[in-house]
């Protein structure tokens, strides 16, 4: 068993962040997968860097416009930013793509009750 089991995850995240920075700056024509974007968004969200997380989410949605998971992340971040009407817009878009995700209805409730 590895002495540092989380080192691989940290190294992977560091590489993803570098890849995103290069892509954003136009220095790379690399491809970032949808789940990798989700990891980057979660990283900024956990650090309470909501503006940065929203920026990554916008870029990710431009690459994956039919991803209900990314639309839900965007709505969640908007709710955290107290932008409830915008959040509801993205929740409605996500609902068109996936009506079975329970997080959709939890976030809708949060937005309406706020």
Model regions and ranges:
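Canonical positions in the second alpha-helix
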Residues: 60, 93-94
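Residue at a conserved register position within TPR or TPR-like alpha-solenoid repeats
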Residues: 43-44, 78, 112
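Structural register within alpha-helical repeat arrays
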Residues: 39-40, 74, 108
């Amino acid at each position: 068993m590895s002495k540092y089991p989380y080192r691989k995850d940290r190294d992977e995240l560091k590489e993803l962040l570098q890849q995103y920075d290069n892509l954003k700056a136009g220095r790379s024509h690399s491809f970032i997968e949808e789940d990798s974007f989700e990891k980057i968004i979660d990283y900024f969200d956990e650090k309470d860097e909501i503006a940065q997380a929203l920026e990554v989410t916008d870029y990710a949605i431009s690459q994956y416009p039919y991803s209900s998971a990314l639309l839900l992340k965007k709505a969640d971040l908007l709710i955290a930013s107290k932008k409830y009407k915008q959040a509801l817009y993205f929740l409605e878009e996500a609902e068109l793509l996936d009506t079975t995700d329970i997080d959709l209805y939890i976030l809708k409730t949060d937005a309406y009750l706020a």
